[in-house]
């Protein structure tokens, strides 16, 4: 059992200041992965040098920067922090909710009125998700036959771009409920694929019949691979049956298509207490829960494979180093079954 000591309070309080400063300096490119020194070109774009200097000075006080000939440089710890600064973006994108917590508790503001920084959220999600992409992409390219990709919840297009690096003669469909994501995705993939070979648009991915009607001619006579990266919790409404219905509709519409699914898991209290010092899962689950997103337990996700129109072909588990061996996230390759009982849905 841990005890309160002289470092407990500063360690908890420090995140209130350090996280926003790291986030904003990273987005402005003050520090990059290429060097420990300040990027002078990007520094010149900063209008308020007073605030910049105070921020840099603060980071030196907490050990992330040191001074070398009157120039700030990243320390070893600082370099590793800024190298992973994309990990700050998604939690930080929900900052309006945290800053309004008092008003929320007093009933003076509704959660739905707290805006998410969509640009930062899209940027952070895309960069954070990269670590989940590599093994599945290698697998699908070596084991599966496909000549088109339907990316449901395409975000900023990072997955699409990673697929195109390995296989560039594809037809691409990207669908997202966020107009910002649609615009960002188009911009990010535009240099890697001919314009007439992709179709990116706004839609609710749970409305399978609708988005299928928009792409039927485009993917006609092709073999689509369907991907869903961290989207099941967006459509579950906390119910397994909603995802099962979605999978059935998807299979009915694309009976020969494999699915690539990545998802985050709702860990129980015991695991969160066990791993909180080395994991951001308490924070991730907090903002997912408070924003009403339906993350399910590992047991619930595994139940999707029972009486399913898909069978599990391959599985990757992430961060399952805890006493219960429960992962914080997983990626599945799901193979479509040729025959299944629709009446079970």
Language model features with spans:
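Conserved SAM/SAH-binding beta-strand->alpha-helix loop
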Residues: 178-180
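C-terminal alpha-helical "lid/dimerization" subdomain adjacent to the S-adenosyl-L-methionine
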Residues: 262-308, 315
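Conserved SAM-binding motif I beta-strand of class I
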Residues: 171-176
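Conserved class I S-adenosyl-L-methionine
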Residues: 145-155
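Conserved Class I S-adenosyl-L-methionine-dependent methyltransferase catalytic core
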Residues: 58-144
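Conserved SAM-binding loop
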Residues: 185-186
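Conserved SAM-binding loop of SAM-dependent methyltransferases across substrates and taxa
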Residues: 156-168
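A short, conserved alpha-helix within the catalytic core of class I
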Residues: 234-249
């Amino acid at each position: 059992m841990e005890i309160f000591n002289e470092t407990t309070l500063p360690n908890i309080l420090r995140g209130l200041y350090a996280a926003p400063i790291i986030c904003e300096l990273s987005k402005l490119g003050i520090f990059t992965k290429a060097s420990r020194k300040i990027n002078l070109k990007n520094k010149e774009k900063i209008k308020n040098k007073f605030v910049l200097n105070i921020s840099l000075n603060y980071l030196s006080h907490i050990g992330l920067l040191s001074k070398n000939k009157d120039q700030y440089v990243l320390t070893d710890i600082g370099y590793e922090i800024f190298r992973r600064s994309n990990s700050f973006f998604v939690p930080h994108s929900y900052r309006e909710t945290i800053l309004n917590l008092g008003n929320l508790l007093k009933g003076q503001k509704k959660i739905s009125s707290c805006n998410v920084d969509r640009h930062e959220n899209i940027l952070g999600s895309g960069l954070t998700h990269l670590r989940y992409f590599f093994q599945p992409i290698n697998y699908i390219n070596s084991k599966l036959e496909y000549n088109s990709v339907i990316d449901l919840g395409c975000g900023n297009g990072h997955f699409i771009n990673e697929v195109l690096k390995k296989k560039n003669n594809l037809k691409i469909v990207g669908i997202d409920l966020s107009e910002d994501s649609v615009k960002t995705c188009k911009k990010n993939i535009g240099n890697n694929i001919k314009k007439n070979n992709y179709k990116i648009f706004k839609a609710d991915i749970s409305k399978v019949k609708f988005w299928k009607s928009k792409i039927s001619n485009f993917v006609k006579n092709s073999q689509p691979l369907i991907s869903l990266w961290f989207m099941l919790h967006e459509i579950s409404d906390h119910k397994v049956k909603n995802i099962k219905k979605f999978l059935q509709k998807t299979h009915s519409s694309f009976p020969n298509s494999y699915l690539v699914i990545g998802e985050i898991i709702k860990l129980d209290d015991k695991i969160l207490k066990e791993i909180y010092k080395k994991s951001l899962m308490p924070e991730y689950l907090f903002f997912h829960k408070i924003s009403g997103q339906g993350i399910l337990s590992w047991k619930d996700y595994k139940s999707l494979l029972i009486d399913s129109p898909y069978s599990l072909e391959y599985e990757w588990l992430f961060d399952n180093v805890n006493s219960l061996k429960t992962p914080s996230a997983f990626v599945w390759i799901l193979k479509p079954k040729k025959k299944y009982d629709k009446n079970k849905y």
